[in-house]
Amino acid sequence: MRIPRIFHPDTLTPQGGETDLSEDAANHVGRVLRMSAGQALQLFDGSNQVFDAEIVQAGKKNVRVRYAAGQTENRESPLHLHLGQVMSRGEKMEFTIQKSIELGVNVITPLLSERCGVKLDGERLEKKIAQWQKIAIAACEQCGRNRVPEIRPVQTLESWCAEPDNGLKLNLHPRAAHSINTLPLPVSRIRLLIGPEGGLSADEIAMTATQGFTDILLGPRVLRTETTALTAITALQVRFGDLG
């Protein structure tokens, strides 16, 4: 049986010790997995270390574990990827976040654009961002990453594109002259823009060009927004990262 991996939001002592799991983790371990004292876990706290652990006490609302000294396990790609994803409807955004993290994305910023079909504000938006961060944690627990990517607050497309960045800035465009295979080597940082289901407006495309974004073409077929993100990330990891 595979040993469950559990994220711990507080820094763990490198030499080992005891700690109570977070409320979310305790609920997952105690109620969902139905684990009990004596069973093994693996903890990670975002420091790129993993900690072998054993449950010493398991109640309905509290789980306490004893953990050994940490061991460094770096599973991060040499390519730093910042995904700017215009928010999509329903579960599509959740799917994009989950799979992008499995593929090695480091930062995700949800974006608002002219043709964005998602209308969220205030408390609903805060709850959605918290939910997306939980999805990011669960994705890391599943795929073996020991650093949890950041889900940043929602921004407008214009403000995100205007942020200083010393990496390569890419925007997918169906009539672009460049493909990923024609991009120059080496590249260690990329800011990747994925537009909404209806695409970016002409003014938005022009704006990305003034902000230093390079238009690239993925291929001859039209992809859905959630497919576009994952296809682009995979291709970039194959060329510049740790896939393939």
UniProtKB/Swiss-Prot annotation:
Query: Gene3D superfamilies, per this entry?
Result: 3.40.1280.10, Hypothetical PUA domain-like, domain 1 (2.40.240.20)
Q: What does this protein do?
A: Specifically methylates the N3 position of the uracil ring of uridine 1498 (m3U1498) in 16S rRNA. Acts on the fully assembled 30S ribosomal subunit.
Q: How does this polypeptide assemble, per the annotation?
A: Homodimer.
The listed locations are: Cytoplasm
Family affiliation: Belongs to the RNA methyltransferase RsmE family.
- GO MF annotations in UniProt: rRNA (uridine-N3-)-methyltransferase activity
Major place of residence: cytoplasm
Looking at its record, which EC class is this enzyme?
A: transferase
The UniProt entry, under InterPro entries, shows: Alpha/beta_knot_MTases, PUA-like_sf, RsmE, RsmE_MTase_dom, RsmE_PUA-like, tRNA_m1G_MTases_N
Q: What's the name of its gene? A: rsmE
Protein name (Swiss-Prot/TrEMBL): Ribosomal RNA small subunit methyltransferase E
Q: What is its EC number?
A: 2.1.1.193
Q: Which organism is it from?
A: Dickeya dadantii (strain 3937)
Keywords tagged on the record: Cytoplasm, Methyltransferase, rRNA processing, S-adenosyl-L-methionine, Transferase
**Which residue ranges does the record annotate as region Disordered?**
1-21
A single GO BP term for this record reads: rRNA base methylation
Catalysed reactions, as listed in the record: uridine(1498) in 16S rRNA + S-adenosyl-L-methionine = N(3)-methyluridine(1498) in 16S rRNA + S-adenosyl-L-homocysteine + H(+)
GO CC annotation terms, alphabetical:
cytoplasm
The record's NCBIfam families line, in alphabetical order, gives:
PRK11713.1-1, PRK11713.1-5, RsmE family RNA methyltransferase
| Pfam short name (any one) | PUA_4
